[in-house]
Amino acid sequence: MVVRARHTVPDVERDWPGFVDMPPVLATAMMIGFIEQTCIQALRPFLSEHQRTVGTHVDVSHVAATPVGMRVTAKVELIDVHGRSLVFRVACFDEGGLIGEGNHQRAIIDLARFTQKVAEKAAKASADSAG
């Protein structure tokens, strides 16, 4: 991934004013999203068409700033499997070296079942707020 302005701290979320005047470097949230995307893509060939994975835990340090225009790479290694739970060792690098590392956990889900549960949760919340 090449860091663009939209990946920087000031552009993460304009509704959160604390970010607006921060330096324009790769946002931690974007680095985590890139790690998740890399894990998703690494797992895709091993899942059925009815399965996906969802992030369940992130323990990653962001140790160096990356300016706009630099290329970032993510390396992920599946280090543990417990049933549907998958644990990855992850690291991100820019052209200057290591920028982040840690562990990321994902869970394998059945897409239809998961989507149904989310719809039920949304319907209940809507009914509760209306009542």
What kind of region is each of these model predictions?
Residues M30-M31, R52, A65, H104, ...:
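Short capping/connector residues at structural and topological boundaries
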